Amino acid sequence: ELESSGLVKRSAKGNLYDIFRHRVMVPIIDVRGNIIAFGGRVMDDSKPKYINSPETMVYHKSRTLFALNVAKKSTSKRYILCEGYMDVISMHEAGFDTAVCACGTALTPEQVKLLTEYADEVVLSYDSDEAGQKATARSLAMFTGTNLQVRVLNIPGAKDPDEFIRTYGRDRFEAVLEGTATPLEFKLAKAVKKYDLRNDAQRLQYVDEAIGILAGSAVSPTARDVYAGRIAEQTGIDKKAVLVQLESAVRGAGRRARRKEQNELSRQGIAADIRVPYDRG
């Protein structure tokens, strides 16, 4: 039973050993309150940093969110999606009781579906390093088409929420939480970091990328005007010129979307110009 639960493994010599030895163990509990697995974290710099229970008859990591059993009891419908167990634990200790995280995997469609059942808003609170930012971008794409409002947390002066809360305290984190970015703002902020805006060529490259992001996003004409103003202010390029290029890009994106839709209809054999002959027999 211990082997099938994933708590122990058998060595090459046939001896059983504890796979979580020298680690802090974190119980993973399902929404009904049953312990179904464990995560184990080292307390030094040894690798791997985390070890998780293998999948069993009752534990499917792609369908499980750590601490959802606690978060679902909260009156708040704003969930905070973290990168690791320790971030979640720190948040709960500080009173943010809707913090959850995936269990040793990247976010999965099944976990997104779980969130839609309990949350109205999801704040992505991943690490501030490059890997965390890439994970944020991947996760944002997975929420496309859901009814959830998604925001992105920027953690200044710390590598993750756990470090930020321990360094600056709960109130500072609450203030940061209230200043989250929309997915569009996150993408634009990520784009501008890639360019030296003092360089003419890079400034134009940034404008092209930013306009591509805006043209591919479902935003109102008013919002496009606001973002065009920000791009103009960042780059020193006339706002009217930015708007002209943006409107051209929006029209181009619309044409491409219509062509893609028509091609898909044609592929399925139900394009508007296809008619099935009437069989008089």
What are these regions (language model features)?
Residues E1-Y118, V122, A135-T136:
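Phosphate-handling DNA/RNA-contact segment within nucleic-acid enzymes
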Residues D30-R32, A71-Y79, A106-V122, D127-G281:
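A charged alpha-helical hairpin associated with nucleic-acid processing machineries
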